[in-house]
Amino acid sequence: MIIVNTKTGKSGKEGKVNVSINHYTSFQQVYNYPEMASVNDWADYWNEAATLIPGVSGFGENDPSQATPIGDISGIPEVDWQDLITRDGRIDNTDINISGNTGKTNYFISYNRFYQEGIIEGSGLERNSIRLNFDTKVNDKLRAGVRLALTDRRQEVNKVNFNQVYFNILPIRQIYDVNGNYTAVNPISGTTQRNPVSDINHRIRHRFVTNILANAYAEYNILPDLTLRTSVGTNLTFNKFNRYVPTVDPIRNLQGTGGKADVDHSRKTGVLNENTLTYSKEIGAHSFKILAGFTLQKDTFSDLGAGGQGSANDVVTFNNLALGAISTTNTIN
């Protein structure tokens, strides 16, 4: 069972305004990094694998005449990719609440700001929320109220392929080559691989979400035992996701494919109208209630995705998809 308590301001002394402010800050840290083989252990393993032959025993043995992929092991610089892509995280949370009542009117207003710097470099979240609850007694027969919640969220989506860092990127692979450019190639297999440091510094992955939840109601006592209640509410969600891989991305730079941009927009709307008529009666030690009503509801969803690649520079990033040599679109309604 989940019980949700809605604050309305009724509990305060009439005519008094109550204000409360709460804040906390916390920190996050990777407690235990997975233990990875040292560069020397890793190099020894690869050299042994490269010189392994069946041998007369059938169990395999190393042939010293075979060429080894890694020569001078002692001179290999080691790159700690785990350390490069992580950091100490931080969370800040602030709540401000204002409530009160004037006898016939109760109100509650709150503001919340949540800010997080993720433990992965370049990731984070900022959320701002405003909530309003308002109830008033217009006269002896009529009561009305409003519920409103606004939330705006900006997320710096993780730019790093974390699995690749653990399972594919070698500790002997350097961040930069001798010319100061980001490396893009596995030094053993020769295949292209993303560079996590380049991803963190240059890729763009922004998500914006705005949600509006609103409801208004009115109750009217037609007779002492007969009450009409009507309410209308809406739930609106707007989502935008911007992504951009720049021209300086080592793989795209190596392949000469230019920048790549993608933008997704989605909108979800819902409208709900509820109408009820309630008759309540007590006769002696007995009571009964009759409820009748109807509901109207409509939900819609639309999504538009567009992309472009082949842009010659990173000046406008995802803000002008027409600059791309290749364009794509996808629409859902």
Question: Which positions does each model-derived feature cover?
Answer:
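Outer-membrane beta-barrel channels and translocator barrels
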Residues: 9, 91, 102-103, 139, ...
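Outer-membrane beta-barrel initiation region
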Residues: 84-88, 98-102
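Short, charged beta->alpha transition segments
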Residues: 94-97, 187
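N-terminal entry motif of extracellular EGF-like repeats
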Residues: 80-81
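Surface-exposed loop/interface segments of Gram-negative outer-membrane beta-barrel transport/assembly proteins
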Residues: 11-77, 118-213, 231-333
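A beta-strand signature from Gram-negative outer-membrane beta-barrel systems
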Residues: 1-20, 91-93, 114-117
